[in-house]
């Protein structure tokens, strides 16, 4: 198994300064929206089965960019899976509700998604495996309010979730 960590060049440089690349891991500097890294991976592993995990990124892209990225992944990684987290519309459209990581920062959430099946309409080669709700993971972390919210899945989806797709 090979792990590839992709991030912006300045983040990869900082990561290399702080954490040397572990054996079997590889850092790739550049934009997630570029296609060269996808083509390089496919060329290097023509028979590879890929699980692509995109964490904490897509909500900062516009919906058009997310759609384009997912189409490009489907073009190149048939048979694999793609997993990513999304903010729901309640968080994406609110000026007042922000994840803790954004408080005090100017970064903006630019897209949100409530129903994971919507992505299947954007890109028919993606088949929803799961739409997992964060409030169901690590209940102690969320406290009483989070556990209570976890009893109402529709509200949770308006906040955030983790989506997984099989690439056909």
What do the predicted segments below correspond to?
Residues 1-3:
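Short, small-residue-biased leader/transition segments that mark boundaries at the very start
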Residues 6-168:
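Alpha-helical subdomain
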């Amino acid at each position: 198994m090979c792990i590839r960590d992709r991030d912006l060049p300045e983040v990869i440089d900082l990561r290399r300064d702080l954490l040397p690349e572990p054996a079997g891991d590889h850092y790739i500097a550049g934009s997630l929206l570029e296609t060269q890294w996808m083509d390089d991976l496919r060329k290097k592993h023509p028979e590879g089965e890929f699980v692509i995990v995109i964490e904490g990124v897509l909500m900062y892209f516009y919906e058009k960019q997310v759609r384009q990225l997912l189409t490009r992944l489907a073009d190149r990684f048939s048979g694999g899976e793609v997993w990513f987290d999304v903010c729901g519309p309640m968080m994406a459209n609110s000026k007042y509700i922000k994840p803790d990581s954004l408080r005090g920062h100017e970064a903006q959430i630019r897209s949100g998604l409530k129903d994971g099946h919507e992505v299947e309409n954007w890109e028919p080669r993606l088949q929803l495996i799961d739409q997992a709700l964060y409030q169901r993971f690590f209940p102690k972390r969320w406290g009483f309010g989070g556990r209570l919210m976890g009893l109402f899945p529709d509200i949770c989806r308006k906040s955030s979730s983790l989506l997984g797709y099989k690439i056909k």
